[in-house]
């Protein structure tokens, strides 16, 4: 199925087995902007098979890669570790999946150097985090509301994982 030319193609690297597989996908979609989603400290299968260092040659060679989401961001240190390695043309997107990440959202977003600030919220993982920490379930929705309000007040784009587009390529 062809995608419209203005689609930003998200690639969840948890599901890409090798760097060669990623390279093949990127070649196939060379005319689309690419949003890479790098799982770090993943707690559910599949496990990530490579690091940001493994990806740097690819990120530097494929200029259509515009965004890099990094999962399980809980502090500004999580952002700085990766951001210092990225070329300036890549927008780093911290992916928030825990109450701790929401509690630290100001320092996280302040540490992102990109002009356009974007964060990503994974509802499912946030819910699991609330359950795992034996927090009241009401904390889940309250935390989402806090994050939404923070983003509105600070001009930050909030991407919310609410659905998936499936593809066989």
What kind of region is each of these model predictions?
Residues 1-169:
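Non-catalytic helical/linker scaffolds that mediate oligomerization, partner binding
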